[in-house]
Amino acid sequence: MILVLDVGNTNIVLGIYNDTKLTAEWRLSTDVLRSADEYGIQVMNLFQQDKLDPTLVEGVIISSVVPNIMYSLEHMIRKYFKINPLVVGPGIKTGINIKYDNPKEVGADRIVNAVAAHEIYKRSLIIIDFGTATTFCAVRENGDYLGGAICPGIKVSSEALFEKAAKLPRVELIKPAYAICKNTISSIQSGIVYGYIGQVRYIVERMKEELQEEGEKEPLVVATGGLAKLISEEAKNVDVINPFLTLEGLRIIYEKNRVKVI
């Protein structure tokens, strides 16, 4: 049994794998002020509520885009699981070739998603991760990670509008029935949701063109992240929604590196 942790700016997603099967999945809020013991108590409670034995965990892997939280999480893993966690970063075997100008700049989450999608789908790829930031990544069929685009997540965009425009309210992120709306709340929802859909459509089509200009076949477009379903279904050019892509990538990377885990 292995424990995988995907640490994002807003949430920490945890998963338990028995071989290749995801048997449990949990979500905690990301808080850099929380101590190792506070995280440890939370995680132990999650194991208890799902009737899982933490002593059966034989390996742990962490991907994080929040450096300031890592001391607490690594200390928690060592104290409560008696394991040195594997951390996604330089020196880790991934099976993909990073063609970024500076490979160290590529976020761990983007690498993990690329590993999972390359392993699962085995073709040219565009990967979209709808998180605090929305990332678009292009991967050749041979596993070359070419780069991509980063933009504010849809929730960040919505919050920025609420915070900077005094008379505009915070709204629920749902798709209105029409683009032409007759009240302020629906009008904001229209602008945010349909505007974001348009952004996704254009970036995907532009990346498809650039990949095909380099000789790649028609890429498969894979989406993941909390708001993938809301945006992808309307964007029309997303082929697959895989909500567990990042967790799968962590499992795959763990298997590639398990001899290094002490």
From Swiss-Prot:
Principal location: cytoplasm
Record pathway: Cofactor biosynthesis; coenzyme A biosynthesis; CoA from (R)-pantothenate: step 1/5
Binding-site residues, ATP: D6, V7, G8, N9, T10, N11, I12, V13, T132
Enzyme class: transferase
List of catalytic residues: D109 (proton acceptor)
Cofactor annotation: NH4(+); K(+)
The UniProt record lists the keyword Kinase: yes
UniProt remark on cofactor binding: A monovalent cation. Ammonium or potassium.
Binding positions (substrate): Y100, G107, A108, D109, R110, T184
Assembly and interaction partners: Homodimer.
Name of the molecule in the record: Type III pantothenate kinase
Native source organism of the sequence: Clostridium acetobutylicum (strain ATCC 824 / DSM 792 / JCM 1419 / IAM 19013 / LMG 5710 / NBRC 13948 / NRRL B-527 / VKM B-1787 / 2291 / W)
Gene: coaX
